[in-house]
Swiss-Prot record:
Highly expressed in mature fruits. It comes from Siraitia grosvenorii (Monk's fruit). The lineage of its organism: Eukaryota, Viridiplantae, Streptophyta, Embryophyta, Tracheophyta. This is Mogroside IIIx synthase. PANTHER family: GLYCOSYLTRANSFERASE. Transmembrane segments: none annotated. Belongs to the UDP-glycosyltransferase family. Coiled coil: none annotated. Pfam families: UDPGT. Its EC number is 2.4.1.-.
Length: 453
């Protein structure tokens, strides 16, 4: 690891171990490197290996230097290949959070050795800005979620007895009943996460970066700035722009299948890298896809270490035979951005993780939301409010309804009843693409002013 590099401004970027966080941080790192900042990108070995194929091949790649974070290794800790949230069995998530916190001492050594001009950190490590402050290194929080859910959480923390001042966006009946008025926190675990997020936001030095854009969340960003007494700078949507002809494991067969379909005739189905639908949820989604009569690609994931599960066992009996060439089911992983960008993709059945919402908007693909937990119901509601998606309503017991899934897929992809959603999704994509790198100007100006460069 090099010490500070001459007169070049150096930035150490330190995301949480989730793939969506890594992806957004990497796209921000690329943008900063194109603006002549030298980037140190710090994560675990398994995560660094995953992002290497997405590093730029041009000379600017020298401006992004990967730095390994070593998590503690002991019999009661996770092995290195599980130092990521990607396909991590859910019961091991608390262990990963604990190991990440225990890496603070090693991160302090990295900070001391590199002595960057600035630390840009994520929202699950309040100890990172504290360590930076002890070395007189300024630190800025980059939040990879939306401003809307952050403002709800912070408002509930600051003013628990006061009504949220912004008109409520869409939140369907089941989620309204489930989430309490306290910013959506319903368990001790959720309260703990909320406290950690709030601490990371408040520790940021006068500026907050957020992976969003004003056309979508301006009113929430303005209120977030008031709550934090900090400048909120949108830098999104930060989305990986794939080369459609580039090599990706398994993509050639997917592309060949997609190339045979009519324009905007296919739905992509995925629930992210950290959520594994139950057997009952899988059956409802499968029956919904079958009844919709729409072409589909469905990515089915199992937790790491689950070598016994077969796709056939996770789906209704005879499902694959009945859908035939109309559907493709992929086990494990598929290049989401490439599939969404393909001209035959006309809808996205999504859990509404924030990165997936941003990708849908960038590529102009309308969303059929099937949120599962955390911030996802709020993200689905925001997409619906913006007119670029619709959410599949659950029954009063919170169960996914196959008829609702089938109906919305047909409406969004095929029928005239949702032409407005398709049109709005295309318009949103055009707005975002017309901005280009303009979204980074405010950020670079804020950083330059902050660092007096």
């Amino acid at each position: 690891m090099d010490a500070q590099r001459g007169h070049t401004t150096t930035i150490l970027m330190f995301p949480w171990l989730g793939y969506g966080h890594l992806s957004a941080f990497l796209e921000l790192a690329k943008s900063l490197s194109r603006r002549n900042f030298h980037i140190y990108f710090c994560s675990t070995s398994v995560n660094l290996d995953a992002i290497k194929p997405k590093l730029p091949s041009s000379s600017s790649s020298d401006s992004i230097q990967l730095v390994e974070l070593c998590l503690p290794s002991s019999p009661d800790q996770l092995p290195p290949h599980l130092h990521t949230t990607n396909a991590l069995p859910p019961h091991l998530m608390p262990t990963l959070h604990q190991a990440f916190s225990m890496a603070a001492q090693h991160f302090a050594a990295i900070l001391h050795t590199l002595a960057p001009h600035l630390l840009i950190y994520d929202s699950f490590q309040p100890w990172a800005p504290q360590l930076a402050s002890s070395l007189n290194i300024p630190a800025i929080n980059f939040n990879t979620t939306g401003a809307s859910v952050l403002t709800r959480m912070l408002h509930a923390t600051h003013y628990p007895s006061s009504k949220f001042p912004i008109s409520e966006f869409v939140l369907h009946d089941y989620w309204k009943a489930m989430y309490s008025a306290a910013g959506g926190a319903v368990t001790k675990k959720d309260h703990k996460i909320g406290e950690t997020l709030a601490n990371c936001l408040h520790a940021s030095c006068s500026v907050i970066l957020i992976n969003s854009f004003r056309e979508l969340e301006e009113k929430y960003m303005d209120y977030l700035s008031v709550l934090l007494n900090k400048k909120v700078v949108p830098v999104g949507p930060l989305v990986y722009e794939p080369n459609q002809d580039g090599e990706d494991e398994g993509y050639s067969s997917i592309k060949n299948w997609l190339d045979k379909k009519e324009p905007s005739s296919t739905v992509f189905v995925s629930f992210g890298s950290e959520y594994f639908p139950s057997k009952e949820e899988m059956e409802e989604i499968a029956h919904g896809l079958e009844a919709s009569e729409v072409h589909f690609i469905w990515v089915v994931r199992f937790p790491q270490g689950d070598n016994t599960s077969a796709i056939e066992d996770a789906l209704p009996k005879g499902f694959l035979e009945r859908v035939g060439e109309r559907g493709m089911v992929v086990k494990g992983w598929a290049p989401q951005a490439k599939i969404l960008k393909h001209w035959s993709t006309g809808g996205f059945v999504s859990h509404c993780g924030w990165n997936s919402v941003m990708e849908s908007m960038m590529f102009g693909v309308p969303i059929i939301g099937v949120p599962m937990h955390l911030d996802q119901p709020f993200n689905a509601g925001l997409a619906e409010e913006a007119g670029v998606g619709v959410e599949a309503k659950r029954d009063p017991d919170g169960k996914i309804q196959r008829d609702e899934v089938a109906k919305l897929i047909k409406e969004v992809v095929v029928e005239k009843t949702r032409e407005d959603v398709r049109k709005k999704a295309r318009e949103m994509s055009e707005i975002l693409r017309s901005k280009g790198e303009e979204k980074m100007d405010e950020m670079v100006a804020a950083i330059s002013l902050f660092l007096k460069i």
